[in-house]
A protein has these predicted regions:
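Extracytosolic and intramembrane catalytic regions of membrane-associated proteins
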Residues: 251-352
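N-terminal membrane-targeting hydrophobic helices
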Residues: 1-232, 236-241, 246, 250-253
Length: 352
């Protein structure tokens, strides 16, 4: 999912897990929840398009990578806190230092939330790198979902002091979210806009009536996470039914060996786009493309060139086109590009 969702869910999660034991738990949760993406800066990103396809959601998002990030962040933050305590103690000042176990538990929860939230969508997750590069997809929740912004933000605001500083922060983030949601009204389902508005009204009432405050902020965060769990679980149940329907349609269309997927739709929770494929064709309900994967030039591109190999390992539904000269091959993932020669999910390979 997007980094704002990771940040807000991570903040709420670490507050729910360790707020009584770790100072600034929400702030640390923001950092920890984005550690898998931030770590990519140390392994070659940003880079070329091929670098992105290979490295994004790569080793830093694997289970091994998560263990390294959890240990590294715990040591970095824990030791930093203790150094700060030692420095301040020389001036007769004190600072609360969290216990190692609670710090590690909160950071682990936030880091692992990133992996799970990426897994629940249609982009995919590779948990077993560096040994196995297989992608896994739950196809439950879209890569961008406004409720994964709004629900944790409301909980964090409810748990804050009634002061203009935290209120201003919540209003800036909430206002930005609202701007993008309303701007995309043609993409976002009407019921989502209605529920979004209702939640905003409830958020304002809860803040002014002090339903939660600093004393109850851990409960507020836990409540928000419970709401997201129920929301995600409901989508998982509906997705299961939709997947069975799509699988049956794929087998009727292309036989028992057909591949298929139920792709999440941004802005339209509880709906999925059908995609079906055989070895020669990839199609949806109202479109169809030849894959051309057996063409000699395509085989050469995906086995002997770096860009081609990058797209081949990434694409869930790989398709290709060879230009009329036979010297250039266009490769794309039909989830995100369908016959186009431009876009982030398209790779152009020139054969020498």
């Amino acid at each position: 999912m997007d980094n704002l969702a990771h940040a807000l869910v991570g903040a709420a999660l670490m507050r729910a897990v360790a707020d009584r034991h770790v100072p600034r738990a929400a702030l640390l949760g923001i950092v920890a929840a984005n550690a898998p993406d931030l770590s990519e800066l140390f392994i070659g990103l940003p880079g070329t398009r091929a670098d992105f396809l290979v490295l994004h959601r790569g080793i830093t998002h694997s289970l091994v990578g998560a263990v390294v990030e959890i240990i590294g962040l715990t040591l970095l933050i824990g030791l930093g806190w203790r150094v700060a305590r030692w420095i301040l103690s020389r001036n007769a000042r004190t600072v609360a230092v969290p216990a190692w176990n609670w710090l590690a538990l909160g950071i682990a929860a936030a880091v692992l939330s990133h992996l799970y939230m990426d897994w629940q969508g249609s982009y995919g997750w590779r948990p077993f790198l560096p040994w196995n590069g297989t992608w896994y997809y739950l196809d439950w929740v879209a890569i961008v979902d406004p409720f994964f912004w709004l629900v944790p933000l409301v909980a964090l605001a409810w748990g804050a002091e009634r002061h203009w500083t935290p209120l201003a922060a919540a209003l800036v983030v909430g206002g930005t979210i609202t701007f993008f949601v309303t701007r995309a009204h043609d993409v976002v389902a009407t019921w989502v806009l209605v529920v979004y508005a209702i939640v905003c009204v409830v958020a304002a009432i809860g803040w002014t009536r002090y339903w939660f405050g600093p004393v109850g902020r851990q409960r507020a965060a836990a409540f928000a996470l419970l709401v997201l769990v129920v929301y995600t679980g409901a989508q998982a149940v509906v997705a299961g039914t939709r997947k069975r329907t799509i699988q049956q349609a794929a087998e009727r269309r292309f036989g028992a060996g057909a591949s298929w997927a139920a792709l999440t739709n941004v802005g339209r929770p509880f709906t999925w786009e059908s995609i079906y494929a055989s070895t020669d064709t990839v199609a949806g309900d109202d479109w169809r493309l030849a894959r051309h994967l057996r063409a000699r030039q395509v085989q050469r591109a995906i086995t002997q060139t770096r860009d081609g190999q990058a797209m081949a390992q990434f694409a869930r539904f790989l398709a290709a086109e060879v230009d009329t000269s036979g010297a250039t091959v266009y490769l794309w993932d039909a989830r995100y590009a369908r016959g186009s020669r431009d876009g982030w999910a398209v790779v152009k390979v020139r054969l020498e």
